Amino acid sequence: MNIFEEGSPFQRFLNKMTDLLVLNLVTLLMCLPVITAGAALTAMHYVLLKMVRGEEGYIVKSFFRSFKRDFRQATVLWILYVALAALMVSNLVLVLEGSGKYPLWLPSSILVVGLLALMFMIYTFAMLSRFDNSIYHTLLNAVTITFSELPRSLEMAVIVLVPLLAFVRFPVLLPFVVLFGLSVPGYGCAVVYDPIFRKIEKQIWEEENAEYPDDREDV
């Protein structure tokens, strides 16, 4: 089989990487105003889950559909996470500069809280892109799933952190970050949380059908 033949595994791989490249550039562009980053991440997860499920259509069109629809809630949630991150970073700097004044376990505790916040954030924007809910319940569900699916949550944290730490250690990787630094780790996360979302969707479907059963009789 010709590897460049339409439908070949190599051709499908190239198509997938092209979609991830386009999605990464659009997401990065919409993150530049900073305040819109939450909506951009939500839209990215919206597209990525469709890609994982083989439902992707027009990448840019799907992205901006979610971006517009979820902008308000995503922006509020993003501001909350930025405020939390700023608080943790300032506390960590304060503790590290005040060497000897604070217990040795305190810096580690702050880092653990930061890791939890990262896992909360991944679920938050991914769930916002998929489920209609209030800000409070989106956060509550993100926290609940983080702990109930802790192995998967830690797996997603690793998927996100390894490329980030690699870039910090090797700045020469900047071109990869620009081209794939958001979409590729995000795609990995979508592969991980897709089974969780499918279970939630099944539960919602069962509850809706139990509430409104088919009242037709067999004839």
Predicted region positions:
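Helix-coil boundary and N-terminal low-complexity module in membrane systems
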Residues: 1-110, 120-123, 127-219
